[in-house]
């Protein structure tokens, strides 16, 4: 399930970034809603169906990477796109909610139980690598999960 979710996440982000300008706002809204639902379902979050979110989108171009950010009460999910082809190369999930973090950590533990050779800070998915990092801000503590090229 976690591999399917991550594949869906990458595919959705890639498709959203390749949409034509007149279609982008509507498509991004649908894609973001799908990502929010998928991410919630992945960790067993019942609130995912009704979760409120907002989207920030800055297209790639002129040697500037593109960015799409989905903000919810539980997390901030950032997609970074290569400026040459607008393909998503990194996903950063900053978790704000203790419940969501607990559920996501449980998902990580299941992965590491099934893959005992991996260290406890990474999870592999195809040619991508999900890396765990601790960050903090003045108002709250985040745990970030970053998907990058291997």
Predicted features and spans:
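Generic cytosolic/nucleocytoplasmic N-terminal low-complexity/intrinsically disordered segments
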Residues: 1-2, 61
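Sec-dependent N-terminal signal peptides
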Residues: 3-15
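Residues at structural and domain junctions
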Residues: 5, 21, 89-90
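Sec/Tat signal peptide C-region and signal peptidase I cleavage site
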Residues: 15-21
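Short, solvent-exposed mixed-charge patches
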Residues: 20, 149-150
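Short N-terminal segments immediately surrounding and downstream of signal-peptide cleavage
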Residues: 21-38
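A cross-family detector of function-defining hotspots
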Residues: 33-142
């Amino acid at each position: 399930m976690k591999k399917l979710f991550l594949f869906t996440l990458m595919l959705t982000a890639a498709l959203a970034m390749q949409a034509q300008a007149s279609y982008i706002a509507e498509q991004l809204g649908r894609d973001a809603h799908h990502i929010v639902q998928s991410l919630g379902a992945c960790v067993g979050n019942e609130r995912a169906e009704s979760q409120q979110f907002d989207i920030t989108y800055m297209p790639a171009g002129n040697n500037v990477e593109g960015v799409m950010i989905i903000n919810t009460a539980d997390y901030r999910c950032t997609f970074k796109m290569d400026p040459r082809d607008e393909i998503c190369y990194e996903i950063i999930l900053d978790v704000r909610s203790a419940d969501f973090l607990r559920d996501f950590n449980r998902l990580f533990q299941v992965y590491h139980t099934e893959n005992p050779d991996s260290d406890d800070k990474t999870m592999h998915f195809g040619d991508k690598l999900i890396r765990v990092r601790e960050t903090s801000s003045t108002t709250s503590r985040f745990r970030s999960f970053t998907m990058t090229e291997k």
